[in-house]
């Protein structure tokens, strides 16, 4: 198992949940955290503990964003009109790597970040290699022609492990995706229950 895979599944074990709904997740076999003390029964979390856990889970879901990156997104969500909770989710889902993942061009957010970094994606006909690139409604994302035969792409497109949400229109034959609109929390097909309201409470302390 690669270091990246190990880190990904470590998050699953720490949270005790199959964060991305992957069939190979170790929590499908056990329900305790990583390490020799992982089997000890956990006590009830304090309010702060619940808030921290919610933040770590949401931050980790999107390829384990750095605290600086995640805080910057929260700050923007907080400045925007409307509910900060909905703004936060909408901004996270408008990242280029998130859309590549949702479109099923690759199997995980980690793979999506690497895929974009390596220059396999174009937005509106132009090559973009920045995972955090903010997509706007109407933007067309496509896999570059020479990248369409990569094993990771072919295998991900062939598998039906998750549905493509309706805020993205995908043509898997052409390997293109149109970002239709910024989604609300209820639109996002998380494999586990997310609590962005607790994330807001964490940063509002």
Curated annotation (Swiss-Prot):
BP terms from Gene Ontology: ribosomal small subunit biogenesis; translation
GO cellular component labels: small ribosomal subunit
Residues annotated as domain S4 RNA-binding: 94-157
Domain of life: Bacteria
Keywords: Ribonucleoprotein, Ribosomal protein, RNA-binding, rRNA-binding
Cell division among keywords: no
Ranges where the record places region Disordered: 1-49
Keyword Transcription recorded: no
Coiled-coil annotated residue ranges, if any: none
GO terms of molecular function: rRNA binding; structural constituent of ribosome
Subunit (UniProt): Part of the 30S ribosomal subunit. Contacts protein S5. The interaction surface between S4 and S5 is involved in control of translational fidelity.
Protein family per UniProt: Belongs to the universal ribosomal protein uS4 family.
General function of this protein: One of the primary rRNA binding proteins, it binds directly to 16S rRNA where it nucleates assembly of the body of the 30S subunit. With S5 and S12 plays an important role in translational accuracy.
Official protein name in the record: Small ribosomal subunit protein uS4
């Amino acid at each position: 198992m690669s270091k990246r895979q190990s880190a990904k599944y470590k998050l699953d074990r720490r949270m005790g949940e199959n964060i991305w709904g992957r069939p190979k997740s170790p929590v499908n076999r056990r329900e305790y955290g990583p390490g020799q003390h992982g089997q000890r029964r956990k006590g009830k979390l304090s309010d702060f503990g619940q808030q921290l856990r919610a933040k770590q889970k949401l931050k980790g879901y999107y390829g384990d964003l750095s605290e600086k990156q995640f805080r910057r997104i929260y700050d923007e969500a907080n400045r925007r009109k409307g509910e900060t909770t909905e703004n936060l989710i909408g901004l996270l889902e408008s990242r280029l790597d998130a859309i590549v993942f949702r479109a099923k061009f690759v199997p995980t957010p980690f793979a999506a970040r690497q895929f974009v970094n390596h220059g396999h994606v174009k937005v509106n006909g132009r090559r973009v290699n920045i995972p955090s690139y903010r997509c706007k409604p109407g933007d067309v994302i496509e896999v570059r022609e020479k990248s369409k035969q990569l094993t990771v792409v072919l295998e991900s497109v062939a598998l039906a492990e998750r549905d493509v949400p309706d805020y993205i229109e995908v043509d898997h034959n052409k390997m293109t995706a149109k970002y239709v609109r910024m989604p609300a929390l209820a639109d996002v097909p998380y494999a586990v229950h997310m609590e962005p309201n607790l994330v807001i409470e964490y940063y509002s302390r």
